[in-house]
Amino acid sequence: MTINNQPEPTNEQRRIIYQARRGLKELDFYFEPYIKELYLTAEAAEQESFAQMLTHEDPDLLDYFTNQSRPEDDAMWALVNKIKTWRHSKSLS
């Protein structure tokens, strides 16, 4: 277990964590806390959706998180909304 009670990441999870570092602060606002607090304990399907999400270009991801467009994959769209809802509820507390 790591300091924040997350399990030690596998090599594949480390690769995904590294890929989650983006060049846009708007995306980092969502991705950094998600990686630190939820990613390692998420179900395998959610981790796979997150990995798939990271294959999208930053402008597309920004559009998803600002509701300008949505990904075709319903599981990815559900994850975008989960991360947004979770992150904004953290900001209010």
Swiss-Prot record:
Give the matching InterPro entries: SDH, SDH_sf, SdhE_FAD_assembly_factor
What keyword terms does UniProt attach to this protein? Answer: Chaperone, Cytoplasm
Q: Which GO terms describe its biological process?
A: succinate metabolic process
> Any idea where this protein resides?
Cytoplasm
**A family per Pfam:** Sdh5
User: What is the protein's known function?
Assistant: An FAD assembly protein, which accelerates covalent attachment of the cofactor into other proteins. Plays an essential role in the assembly of succinate dehydrogenase (SDH, respiratory complex II), an enzyme complex that is a component of both the tricarboxylic acid cycle and the electron transport chain, and which couples the oxidation of succinate to fumarate with the reduction of ubiquinone (coenzyme Q) to ubiquinol. Required for flavinylation (covalent attachment of FAD) of the flavoprotein subunit SdhA of SDH and other flavinylated proteins as well.
What family is reported?
Belongs to the SdhE FAD assembly factor family.
This protein is called what? FAD assembly factor SdhE
